Amino acid sequence: GIRSQPRSRGLGDVYKRQERILAIMKDSHIGSYGVIGLIFYFGLFYLLVSSLPIELAGCAILAGDPFCKGVSSMIINRLPYARKEEEAKNKTVYSRMTSREYVFSIICAFLPLLWLPQPVYLLAGIFPVITWYFLTSFMKRKIQGYTGDCCGATFLLSELSFYMGFVIIYQTI
């Protein structure tokens, strides 16, 4: 359900203690800030994608979605899970990737970039990497790890940054 609260929720919360932040994030109800965030996400996604010609928008989505998922998946190699395994919502805690899994993940992330019509659009891939780095640094400072919610938010924001970079490149060439 949707719930309005006078304070922020999760990572942006005014609380400083890791335990309190994680307790708030464990609540599966979406708050008013979550609703506002989703409205901004879908609005910005629509504005960015619709500002491109249809063929280019299709290429951006086909390349950007899997690339950003690959970038975001690296969160498990940079940060530990922030909760104890028995406290996880779905009782699943991911372990770091082996070298083989890491290489396979990188290959799978980069292969869809072949959909891009010109090599200059590869520069859009820098944006999600920078976004991922700053978000994971923030998570490390606030909760000393990641949660499933953090993974989802990292993907969505990385994806938006890819489309922003793509549109910037399109408008400058």
What are these regions (language model features)?
Residues 18-28, 32-35, 101-105:
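Membrane-interface alpha-helices at helix entry/exit sites of multi-pass transporters
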Residues 10, 16, 20, 105-106, ...:
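Generic alpha-helical secondary structure signal
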Residues 13-22, 151-158:
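Alpha-helical membrane segments and immediately flanking helix-loop junctions
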Residues 1-15:
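Single conserved hydrophobic/aromatic residue that forms the stacking wall/gate
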Residues 1-4, 23, 141:
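Short, flexible active-site loop motifs that bind/organize anionic cofactors or intermediates
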Residues 34-173:
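Hydrophobic alpha-helical transmembrane segments
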